[in-house]
């Protein structure tokens, strides 16, 4: 009996060529995560400071603009309105910090919107636990 390995080989090739970001099912890639320490350094140095947008319940980080929780459509519209004045290659950092990163209801809708609008240089602040533990308790700059 002759076995046909072509379908299996085809599946292996397709799976090897998948975008690594698609495996996480997140709208951002690893390269689009910005560590809090690096953003703090940029704010402190005053050089190369990106546009910083809070998409959560409060404005904590120095120099940031508050939009409100982006789980709500009216705040997604506020974000859309704000960034309509930005260039597609502007450096932009979004952050929330309301809860552990994996459970946050605000970051995915906001980041998805930025992708759909064609922004090329937007990042998500890598707040793994919450804004208190990952920013305030670290002594980083606050409003």
Stretch-by-stretch model annotation:
Residues 11-61:
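Flexible, polar/low-complexity N-terminal or interdomain linker segments that lie immediately upstream
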Residues 1-2, 14:
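Intrinsic disorder/low-complexity signature
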Residues 10-11, 114:
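Generic alpha-helical structural signal
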């Amino acid at each position: 009996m002759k076995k046909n390995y072509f379908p299996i080989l085809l599946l292996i090739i397709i799976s090897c060529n998948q975008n690594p970001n698609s495996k996480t099912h997140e709208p951002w890639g690893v390269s689009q995560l910005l560590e809090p320490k690096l953003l703090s350094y940029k704010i402190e140095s005053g050089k190369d400071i990106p546009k910083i947008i809070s998409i959560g319940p409060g404005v904590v980080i120095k120099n940031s603009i508050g939009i409100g929780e982006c789980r709500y459509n009216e705040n997604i519209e506020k974000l859309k309105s704000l960034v309509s004045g930005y260039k597609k290659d502007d450096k932009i950092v979004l952050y929330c910090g309301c809860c552990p990163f994996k459970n946050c209801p605000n970051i995915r809708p906001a980041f998805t919107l930025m992708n759909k609008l064609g922004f090329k240089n937007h990042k998500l602040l890598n707040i793994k636990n919450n804004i208190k533990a990952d920013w305030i308790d670290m002594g980083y700059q606050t409003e």
